[in-house]
Amino acid sequence: MPRDFSLDKVRNIGIMAHIDAGKTTTTERILFYTGKTHKLGEVHEGTATMDWMVQEQERGITITSAATTCYWKGHKINIIDTPGHVDFTVEVERSLRILDGAVAVFSAKEGVEPQSETVWRQADKYHVPRIAYVNKMDVIGADFFNVIDMIRERLGANPVAIQIPIGKEDTFRGIVDLIKMEAIIYKDDLGTVMDETEIPEDLKPLAEEYREKLLEAIAEVDETIMEKYLEGEEITEEEIHAALRKGTINGELVPVVCGSSYKNKGVQPLLDAIVNYLPSPLDLPPVKGMSIDGGEELERKPDDNEPFSALAFKIMADPYVGKLAFFRVYSGTLKAGSYVLNSTKGKKERIGRILRMHANHREEIDAVYTGDIAAAVGLKDTTTGDTLCDENHPILLESMDFPEPVISVAIEPKTKAAQEKMSIALSKLAEEDPTFKTYTDQETGQTIIAGMGELHLEIIVDRLRREFNVECNVGKPQVAYKETITKPVRVEGKFIRQSGGRGQYGHVWLEMEPAPRGEGYIFENRIVGGVIPKEFIPAVDAGIQEAMQNGVLGGYPVIDVKVALVDGSYHEVDSSDMAFKIAGSIAFREGMKKADPVLLEPIMKVEVVVPEEYMGDVIGDLNARRGKVEGMETRSGARVIRAFVPLAEMFGYATDLRSKTQGRGTYTMQFHHYEEVPKNIAEQILSAKK
């Protein structure tokens, strides 16, 4: 099968937003108008095409990023649906990594909310060009121009309106296109009958003012337009489109459109903007990677003739076909049934079938090309963030780094018989979601699940019940404490058994030192002259990592440590992987005790929005929770307090905040960093654990 669309006609986009800005409804409408769904799905009836996991339909929030392909005016658009709830920011990171452009959806009433800021900053990190869509123009309190100001002030972006609304709230009936300088009025409920007419008289002055602003903004990013603008010459529609496209792709401006997805108004012009201003894979620089030995930097151009390279960005357990691996192709082509190298794991994989996904129906295709997003069946060893590539031209694309879980609960099946079923289900879910971990507590023998927040774990328990028929009892949430060291040490680890029969001999010297916060574990091999043979080095590394699972203070995992293997010895006959693994483990535990270990706790970034009169109480309460207030500002009549608070102090905060503010306060929180627990509190935690 030859390529169906040339690469410049492909758009890989994500739709990002705060939890209630209307993102799923917007995606739904896009699928409706591009002819992919034949009945409109409503989120509050629980049938939206993208929200295909049952819990999402119940909660009305989008959790897993489903990838969907649709077509508009000769272009192929691959949409990655991203969740808007803070517990799922990892899903957002994961999808931003493989997008070329994004649509940021804002509610015309609330404007820029905390989660929209978080997602916006993540998109900045990956330099994702975007357009803004101001949705819900039909709701009471809608204010298009206020949202534009907020995008400028709160996000530090350069928003450029290319439309202005006609009417607002219940009189919202269309838009003024500032490029063509004409009005588009919607005539029917489905938004398929539109009148392109003259701009209403009362709106002409405003339209002229915003057309001027549009021309000024594009003159800033395009010199030829600047000259024409200063000379007072006519600037053509084509020139405006080209300058907006250039400015958007370079990240110099953000075109802003408006509408009401729920009322079916403004969606087709949004689709036009996606095609006109967001980049194709050709508009972006070649993707960078490393050679497998990490020695040289390589790149792959977006071209079908380059060697194949792709990134697996999502693994899903599918009830019909087993494990689905969603991947984005950066270069080359791939046929179903062929072999690829998973360069992250160093394993060959056979691509069974390749599926192009529509929210809940799938089409089997026999090949994928540069710029495509598809799902593969049959990959055994591939997990999220792995690189797939041509085995004759290996490359390692930059992987994604996922935050460690910050909250854990003990979980047990309601019947003993379901224990094994639960274990299998949990390992499947952990494979799908890199921020979800499951393990057995060594001391109590309980199964522990850990994730990014209470909602995250609730949804996991829910999926156990629905998808795997496992009913569970869940314990009280626990904070994921960690341990680390505070001073450098040099230690020896010996494991020698030589009494009769085959002996064991492993002997290592390690140098351990604290690593910067957030660095995790860094292992360095400094062995010279073969005092320990090369084949035993990975075993030492594995032994250290095993010992790191249980620290010496309270058995918590150890993080942020740099370990160098500097010396040791071996025995021709008795040395084995096992012996060196145990020696590495012994040395690490010994070193841990000597290196002044401390307890670390997760610190959350908390943002509380409250009416002015409750501010004193709320700040006092945050201080009592060991919080550090970082800053305050006023946002649409309410006060916003930003603080860093230990997670341990935040359990039950939702209820406390409601009662302190008579239900008028709201808050969001997400993990920010780990820091040392104050001595007196660390003592309490550790004595409770004993």
UniProtKB/Swiss-Prot annotation:
Keywords: Cytoplasm, Elongation factor, GTP-binding, Nucleotide-binding, Protein biosynthesis. GTP binds at residues 17-24, 81-85, 135-138. InterPro entries: EFG_II (IPR041095), EFG_III (IPR009022), EFG_III/V (IPR035647), EFG_IV (IPR047872), EFG_V (IPR035649), EFG_V-like (IPR000640), EFTu-like_2 (IPR004161), G_TR_CS (IPR031157). Coiled coil: none annotated. GO terms for cellular component: cytoplasm. It is found in: Cytoplasm. GO terms for molecular function: GTP binding; GTPase activity; translation elongation factor activity. It comes from the Bacteria. Transmembrane segments: none annotated. The keyword GTP-binding applies. CDD domains: EF-G (cd01886), EFG_III (cd16262), EFG_mtEFG1_IV (cd01434), EFG_mtEFG_C (cd03713), EFG_mtEFG_II (cd04088). Residues 8-282 form the tr-type G domain. GO terms for biological process: ribosome disassembly. Its main location: cytoplasm. SUPFAM superfamilies: EF-G C-terminal domain-like, P-loop containing nucleoside triphosphate hydrolases, Ribosomal protein S5 domain 2-like, Translation proteins. Belongs to the TRAFAC class translation factor GTPase superfamily. Classic translation factor GTPase family. EF-G/EF-2 subfamily. Catalyzes the GTP-dependent ribosomal translocation step during translation elongation. During this step, the ribosome changes from the pre-translocational (PRE) to the post-translocational (POST) state as the newly formed A-site-bound peptidyl-tRNA and P-site-bound deacylated tRNA move to the P and E sites, respectively. Catalyzes the coordinated movement of the two tRNA molecules, the mRNA and conformational changes in the ribosome. This is Elongation factor G. The gene is fusA.
